[in-house]
Regions:
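Histidine-centered nuclease catalytic patch
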Residues: 24-55, 68, 105
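Pre-Walker A (Motif I) flank of P-loop NTPase domains
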Residues: 72-77, 142-144
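Conserved nucleotide-sensing/catalytic segment adjacent to the nucleotide-binding pocket
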Residues: 96-166
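ATP-dependent NMP and nucleoside kinases share a basic, alpha-helical "lid"
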Residues: 110, 150-202
């Protein structure tokens, strides 16, 4: 990640054109901008031009890291829904032949075909694999079509993942399954707790 400063004359033009409020608006944003942020990251060939620069607060700039805005490199989609939601059916008509799907359930199934018997350790391993894949793909400068699939849009490192996705212009899809339909299923204790957390979010 580059640390050299932008030419003050270019920065002045950026502020005159776009203002000096943080343009990212990540969770915890301090609003007042103190740093320069590249729309196309410098590491991906982004230039110090007025068109490619915006002002950001230190917090949001650090939180973004080198993640691309959706469409400036990888195009990123997120699909979220309650336990046992039919994610595959929801995405079926939208996936391309070369789409990349990062699914917690699929990763867990690869580790433990009988998911109901998955230990906490295996669930943690699947979560770490999901995080690693999502983090790497979110920084890709290649024109990939990436679909991130999970139930709860949060993790220990990213407690408000949904707000981050929206700030980075991800295409977010919410699968709306009535609560009574979900709780009528033969859920595992883990799925039941997750379902309670999901419906407490009141996402639509």
């Amino acid at each position: 990640m580059r640390r050299q400063t932008v030419d003050p004359r270019i920065r002045a033009k950026v502020i005159a054109t776009y203002g000096n409020r943080c343009w990212l608006g990540m969770p915890g944003c301090s609003i007042t901008a103190t740093e320069d942020d590249h729309i196309v990251p410098y590491s991906h060939g982004g230039r110090d031009t007025v068109a490619n620069l915006r002002r950001a607060c230190k917090h949001c700039n650090a939180m973004r890291q080198d993640r691309v805005l959706s469409g400036y490199g990888a195009t990123l989609h997120a699909v979220i829904g309650p336990p046992r939601a039919d994610f595959g059916m929801a995405m079926q008509s939208m996936l391309r032949r070369d789409s990349i799907v990062v699914s917690f359930d699929s990763l867990l199934r690869d580790l433990c075909p009988t998911q109901s018997k998955a230990t906490d350790g295996l669930r943690l391993a699947a979560a770490m694999a999901w995080d690693g894949a999502a983090r790497t793909l979110a920084k890709s400068s290649e024109p990939l079509d990436v679909w991130l699939v999970r139930t709860l849009p949060r993790s220990r490192r990213h407690p408000d993942m949904l707000a981050e996705w929206l700030a980075l212009d991800y295409d977010v899809h919410v699968i709306e399954t009535p609560a009574d339909s979900t709780f009528a299923l033969d859920l595992t204790p883990q799925e039941y707790r997750t379902a309670q957390q999901w419906y407490a979010l009141h996402l639509t």
